[in-house]
């Protein structure tokens, strides 16, 4: 899943900032998955020359914004019963990648006159609720296993490229925000009626691999990049994670 918003290299953008508020153009990409599945690979791509809504209070000016939001719900549950031997398993594999970038290209000139802002903002929010479980019962031997694997990669980047010249009558803000909330429950339960204490064997395994890259930057490796503002210049990156895992 890729969401890009940018001003191309060498472009010239001027906002007179004669109005009180900016009229945002929404370039939001949203992915929703609500189903039982064993494997998810999301490779959709979207590139736009757009502006996007964000949680910013701004005067009229120039906004280059990219926003991506993913809500993933997964339920994988199995069960089995037998008078003799009962074996059951649940396996879930989730692989997901998201790239959200907002930038002003090389040698671009962006001017926001009067009391206008220049905003370059990338925001990516992710919510995952994942439940994997099994229940088995038998009169002799009962065995069950639940295995859940999540691999998630995110790149959230807001930047001004080399050689660009930004002039703002108010503030210049370059901001990258990434938020993640994961709730993972992996449960395996079994019973062997009348069997020995070793007659019921159950296991639950949860593996989570998260690779996040959240950056906000002004590049100037080979050419000078000039930012001038009558107000403030802010460059920051923020990554917030809430992870709850229950396995047993």
List the predicted regions and their residue ranges.
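Low-complexity, glycine- and small/polar-enriched segments
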Residues: 1-248
